[in-house]
């Protein structure tokens, strides 16, 4: 069960999220068992479509606080985010693929953020950038949402207060890896209309042994 299937619930009474998630296997394996030729063709189509999607991620020009300054710094010539096909900032959510929540999400701003997200066309992804967007950060008060995942489905979390532009670029590469393993509907008529996502281990778990093995910490001059 290395994949999760997310289906939209049209009759759900909840405002958001109107979806259910369950563990499953890669649907390509089922296609291969039924018909090897059609299974390989379907796998190739998903590979081509995912390649195009992951190399053409247009972010929505949207910022809430100081993390937005670090985000736009990644678009300068020093970092050159154009290498990843993500340099085209869009002023309209209808033309964007990725929404980066960069900053502090206030309670009054939450309905606006959610409405902008709903205006984005599928496929769409969300990156939570910074401690405030991840968990409220230092603002454990009534006016700040304690994490945007309370009302939005977050794909990638970026720790830091604020995170550096390199962290944003790293998040883009992780999102590209996630998109490369996705299985989305290729037609609104044929096949399952849910979204299959591969379960990816968090960077914290993957790098745990590496961090534990560090005994001699480098000095500030070597960093």
UniProtKB/Swiss-Prot annotation:
Its EC number is 7.1.1.-. GO terms for molecular function: 4 iron, 4 sulfur cluster binding; iron ion binding; NADH dehydrogenase (ubiquinone) activity; NADH:ubiquinone reductase (non-electrogenic) activity; quinone binding. Residues 1-21 are annotated as: Disordered. It catalyses: a quinone + NADH + 5 H(+)(in) = a quinol + NAD(+) + 4 H(+)(out). GO terms for biological process: aerobic respiration; electron transport coupled proton transport. Keywords: 4Fe-4S, Cell membrane, Iron, Iron-sulfur, Membrane, Metal-binding, NAD, Quinone, Translocase, Transport, Ubiquinone. Signal peptide: none annotated. It is found in: Cell membrane. InterPro entries: NADH_UbQ_OxRdtase-like_20kDa, NADH_UQ_OxRdtase_20Kd_su. [4Fe-4S] cluster binds at residues 66-67, 132, 161. GO terms for cellular component: plasma membrane; respiratory chain complex I. PROSITE patterns: COMPLEX1_20K. Binds 1 [4Fe-4S] cluster. It is a peripheral membrane protein. Belongs to the complex I 20 kDa subunit family. NDH-1 shuttles electrons from NADH, via FMN and iron-sulfur (Fe-S) centers, to quinones in the respiratory chain. Couples the redox reaction to proton translocation (for every two electrons transferred, four hydrogen ions are translocated across the cytoplasmic membrane), and thus conserves the redox energy in a proton gradient. HAMAP family: NDH1_NuoB. This is NADH-quinone oxidoreductase subunit B. It comes from Buchnera aphidicola subsp. Schizaphis graminum (strain Sg). The gene is nuoB.
